[in-house]
C-alpha cells in the first residue's frame, strides 16, 4: 500500500495508515507532497508508526524537488499495490494516471463544497465515466468522498479552479 497526500490532503491518512498496519501487518509507504517544507504535515507521525516516508516539495526545500506523481513513479507500484490519494485535483489526476499505468489499484478522496451534505443540492457533484443515465454525475457527499479513480472523468473537471 502507498499513501499519497498533497498538502492538507494528509488529514485522514494517519488513521488509514494505522488501519492498514493492523489489517495487513505491514506499514504503508507514504508520499507527503507540498509546495514547500513548511507545508509538510505528519511526517514524524507516520515515521513513528513505522511507515517509510518520502517527501516531495515543489521548491526542493525538503525531500526531493518533484511532484507527487513523479515520486510515485519512482516507487514503481505494481498490480499488487493499492494507492490512496488525497490532495489538489491536478495532483490526484496525475498521480492516478501513474498508478493506473503501473497496474496498481487506486482510490482518491475528493473534497467539495457541500451545502446540504445529503445530496439534494448537487453542489458537490463531479462527473463520472459512467454512460448510465443518472450515474454520470456523482455526489461527493453521498456517493463518496472516496472513489475508484477509474470512475472519475478527470478531463471534465476544470483544474484552474483548484488553487
Residue locations for each model-derived region?
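FNR/FR-type flavoprotein reductase catalytic core
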Residues: 1-113
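Short Fe-S-cluster ligation motifs
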Residues: 48, 126-127, 138-163
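Local cysteine-cluster metal-coordination motifs and their immediate loop/turn environment
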Residues: 10-12, 89-91, 111-146
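Short secondary-structure transition/capping segments
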Residues: 24-26, 77-81, 106, 130-136, ...
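Short, surface-exposed amphipathic charged segments that create phosphate/polyanion-binding patches used
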Residues: 67-73, 120-125, 155
Amino acid at each position: 500500500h502507498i499513501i499519497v497526500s498533497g498538502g492538507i490532503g494528509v488529514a485522514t491518512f494517519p488513521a488509514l495508515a494505522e488501519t492498514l498496519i493492523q489489517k495487513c501487518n505491514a506499514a504503508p509507504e507514504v508520499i507527503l507532497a507540498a509546495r514547500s517544507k513548511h507545508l509538510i504535515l505528519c511526517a514524524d507521525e507516520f515515521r513513528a508508526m513505522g511507515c517509510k516516508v518520502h517527501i516531495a516539495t515543489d521548491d526542493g526545500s525538503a525531500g526531493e524537488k518533484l511532484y507527487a506523481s513523479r515520486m510515485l513513479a519512482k516507487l514503481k507500484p505494481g498490480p499488487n499495490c493499492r494507492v490512496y490519494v488525497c490532495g489538489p485535483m491536478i495532483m490526484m489526476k496525475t498521480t492516478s494516471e501513474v498508478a493506473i499505468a503501473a497496474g496498481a489499484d487506486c482510490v482518491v478522496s475528493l473534497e467539495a463544497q457541500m451545502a446540504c451534505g445529503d445530496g439534494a443540492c448537487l453542489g458537490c457533484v463531479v462527473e463520472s465515466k459512467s454512460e448510465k443515465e443518472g450515474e454520470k454525475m456523482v455526489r461527493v457527499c453521498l456517493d463518496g468522498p472516496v472513489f475508484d479513480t477509474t470512475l472519475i472523468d478527470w478531463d471534465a473537471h476544470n483544474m484552474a479552479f483548484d488553487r
